[in-house]
UniProtKB/Swiss-Prot annotation:
Pfam families: HCS_D2 (PF22617), HMGL-like (PF00682), LeuA_dimer (PF08502). It is found in: Cytoplasm. It comes from Shewanella amazonensis (strain ATCC BAA-1098 / SB2B). Catalyzes the condensation of the acetyl group of acetyl-CoA with 3-methyl-2-oxobutanoate (2-ketoisovalerate) to form 3-carboxy-3-hydroxy-4-methylpentanoate (2-isopropylmalate). CDD domains: DRE_TIM_IPMS. Residues 392-522 are annotated as: Regulatory domain. This is 2-isopropylmalate synthase.
Length: 522
């Protein structure tokens, strides 16, 4: 049996299901490229049959990813498998992941079939998926609550039908490590053809045991772990990729296992997912929390000064978190910026130097000193920009009346090829800015969530504004970063404006295509 544990990332499928607003295709591609740099073996990037948007996302990612295997989910239905195969057909290497429920409560209450009928459906789905690829994964949904005799029968049948990976999910996060490890061990003891497949696990965190259960599973012989960046996912979330990677790296002496994960990309990938998904990382989160390498106790600090490994079992540098406190100013040249970006793991193709340096100089003139987290924030915002932004905010001026609490905002917007200047009042500067932007764009957006955060520390921190907006029965997520909170708020709104404009454009194109089909192609 191999000592390598395959990392199957499902941030863009299971993880995205937890978001208030779906990621755009471009945002999903950003995450996929980051996962490829991170070194995940397999990335599950969507459920193509569920919507045209998911189909497009899977197809786009499949077209761009070269080193990781791209996977799509499907129920044990031919139409689902057809959609997955079609979306994945452009990929260098791909996997079809099909599943069906196996626990008594799911079989009887959800599927309303007998177990034998469900077993036949599973076998049929695996055989059908094998028409498109040799790499088929089969999942026994709610395996943690499935009678062990039934689970053994299902696993043996799926392997015989051609599945090369068998996934054992603890779908509702119900089991404890000794119990879950025992399930995996029993499968190895009782399923005669189990050596013909890789055993995978997919653990949820409802009882806070997803990582512990996954480790127990690999100790029992499983060799694939399904996980997400920052542990995001349904309900309480999934097994955390960064925790699994660092457990296996840090305790290789005990576990004797390894992964292909490039740990120095962990911090960068975690930050990207947090920002794009509008899901802040709790400060005490293992590995990637802001307090993960912070020592407050005097005894601990004294020990750290004497020997770093007295209280650190891993280093910040090992996950790509650089301790270099070099401050950059408007006098710093391009070579300094390039050097700092390289040290943070960014290649020349990850950003445009002209755009980044211009933004850096503008920020340095405002702040004086610019830090690593500022550069990362600027690179992040550059990546969000679309070539075809319909709305561009060129200038924003706000005046406030401190006595009455009223404010006036004047905004100059480029709307398509036209430049428009509008002014409006509001209850405070942010409200005034939003009213002015609405006038300039003739687009009304209902804000359902507004979050103000910070990138960095103290008075030099950048303001980060995340908004969720409701438009045409869909949620859209916008983000803005600036030294000024009002400007960051305006940027977030303009970001959402562009997303909704593109959504309208896509809907119109689909309508035209439908009308063309109805007219027989005329």
């Amino acid at each position: 049996m191999s000592d390598r544990v395959i990392i199957f990332d499902t941030t863009l499928r299971d993880g995205e299901q937890a978001l208030a607003a779906s990621l755009s295709v471009k945002e999903k591609l950003q995450v996929a490229l980051a996962l490829e740099r991170l070194g995940v073996d397999v990335m599950e990037v969507g459920f193509p049959v569920s919507s045209p948007g998911d189909f497009e996302s899977v197809q786009t990612i499949a077209r761009h990813i070269k080193n990781s295997r791209v996977c799509a989910l499907s129920r044990a239905l031919e139409k689902d498998i057809d959609a997955a195969a079609q979306a994945l057909s452009v990929a260098e290497q791909f996997r079809i992941h099909t599943f069906i429920s196996t626990s008594n409560i799911h079989v009887e209450s959800k599927l309303k079939r007998s177990f034998d009928q469900v077993l036949d459906m599973a076998v049929g789905a695996v055989k059908y998926a094998r028409r498109f690829t040799d790499d088929v994964e089969f999942s026994c949904e709610d395996a943690g609550r499935t009678p062990i005799d039934n689970l053994c029968r299902m696993v043996e049948a799926a392997i015989s039908a051609g599945a090369r990976t068998i996934n054992i999910p603890d779908t509702v996060g119900y089991t404890v490590p000794s119990e879950f490890g025992g399930i995996i061990q029993t499968l190895f003891n009782r399923v005669p053809n189990i050596d013909q497949a890789v055993i995978s696990v997919h653990c949820h965190d409802d009882l806070g045991l997803s990582v512990a259960n996954s480790i127990a599973a690999v100790q029992a012989g499983a060799r694939q772990i399904e996980c997400t960046v920052n542990g995001i996912g349904e309900r309480a979330g999934n097994c955390s990729l960064e925790e699994i990677a660092m457990i296996l790296a840090t305790r290789k002496d005990m576990l004797g296992l390894y992964t292909n994960i490039n740990a120095r990309e962990i911090h960068r990938t975690s930050s990207l997912v947090s920002q794009l998904c509008n899901m802040p990382i709790q400060p005490n989160k293992a590995i990637v929390g802001s307090n993960a390498f912070t020592h407050s106790s005097g005894i601990h600090q004294d020990g750290m000064l004497k020997a770093q490994n007295t209280y650190e079992i891993m280093t910040p540098e090992s996950i790509g978190l650089n301790r270099n406190n070099l401050n950059m100013t408007s006098r710093s040249g391009r070579h300094v910026i390039k050097h700092r970006m390289e040290e943070m793991g960014y290649g020349a193709g990850d950003y445009d130097m002209d755009t980044l340096y211009a933004a850096f100089l503008k920020l340095a003139d405002k702040k004086g000193q610019v830090f690593d987290y500022d550069l990362e924030a600027l690179a992040f915002m550059e990546a969000q920009a679309e070539d075809d932004d319909h709305y561009v905010m060129e200038q924003l001026v706000v005046q406030s009346d401190s006595t009455e609490g009223k404010a006036t905002a004047t905004v100059r917007m480029r709307v398509g090829d036209e430049v428009i200047t509008e002014a409006a009042t509001g209850n405070g500067p942010v409200d005034a800015a939003y009213n002015a932007i609405a006038r300039a764009t003739h687009r009304t957006i209902n804000i359902s969530s507004y979050k103000l955060g910070a990138k960095g520390e103290g008075q030099n921190a950048l303001g980060q504004v995340d908004i969720t907006a409701r438009y045409d029965d869909r949620n859209f997520h916008g983000v803005g970063l600036a030294t000024d909170v009002v400007e960051a708020s305006a940027q977030a709104l303009v970001h959402v404006m562009n997303l909704t404009w593109r959504a309208d454009k896509v809907a119109y194109c689909k309508q035209q295509m439908q009308q063309t089909r109805e007219l027989g192609g005329v």
